[in-house]
């Protein structure tokens, strides 16, 4: 099959360390076929990806390149990822991370300029707080597009570490579990009114078999083979109509 970029065959190149360095595609056009680089990779001396170049418009002579640059801290944790459109020089997407001594992410700043609509673009910072057991207890999201408006979400847990509540100040979601610590219900409330309840069922092997949504009346059912591999998903709506995904 041929992709929308005209690529109908791929070849892979590796360096002496066995690290993937290039993906090449055979591009079919009216003038015949030519081999072009679809993506290239460079690494640091430890094998961590430093840079990826994606070549987007392979059918035209002036390939559109997106360069993805990755930087790491002294503990080899990703510190920053930047995706730049080399045709315009504009940073299209970027992520910056900070960590605590346990390598939990404490702050993430995200910029996403890919959406065409300004309202859909992203420029925000999210701060994460953890308890002594390393469980996430709070996130604070600062929206830099909207006068640094903030949104806080808090999380609570039971004594065995199951999340029992999520609260964003407007909506509260409570979680209950069965004796095997499998999620049994998720109840979403707005104010004092119940907005939605999801009910979960499992088979004797612990596979999730059903998810029922009381708000929509929809039930998702999951079937497994003898080796507990998912083999079928079916969705039944409130009118009893079933769609099967195999």
Over which residues does each language-model region extend?
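Acidic/glycine-rich beta-solenoid
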Residues: 1-246
């Amino acid at each position: 099959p041929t992709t929308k970029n005209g690529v109908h065959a791929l070849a892979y190149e590796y360096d002496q360390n066995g690290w993937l360095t290039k993906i090449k595609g055979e591009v079919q056009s009216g003038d015949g076929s030519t081999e072009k680089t679809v993506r290239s990779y460079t690494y640091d001396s430890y094998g961590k990806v430093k840079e990826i170049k994606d070549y987007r418009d392979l059918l035209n002579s002036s390939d559109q390149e997106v360069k993805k640059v990755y930087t790491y801290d002294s503990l080899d944790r990703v510190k920053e990822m930047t995706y730049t459109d080399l045709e315009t020089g504009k940073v299209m997407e970027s992520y910056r991370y900070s960590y605590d001594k346990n390598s939990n992410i404490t702050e993430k700043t995200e910029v996403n300029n890919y959406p065409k609509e300004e309202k859909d673009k992203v420029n925000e910072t999210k701060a994460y707080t953890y308890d002594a057991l390393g469980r996430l207890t709070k996130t604070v999201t600062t929206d830099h597009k909207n006068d640094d408006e903030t949104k806080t979400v808090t999380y609570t847990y039971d004594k065995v570490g199951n999340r029992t509540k999520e609260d964003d100040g407007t909506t509260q979601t409570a979680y209950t579990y069965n004796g095997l610590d499998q999620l049994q219900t998720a109840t979403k409330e707005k104010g004092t009114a119940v907005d939605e309840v999801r009910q979960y069922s499992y088979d004797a092997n612990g596979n999730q078999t059903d998810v029922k949504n009381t708000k929509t009346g929809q039930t998702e059912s999951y079937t497994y083979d003898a080796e507990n591999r998912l083999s079928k998903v079916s969705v039944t709506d409130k009118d009893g109509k079933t769609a099967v995904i195999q």
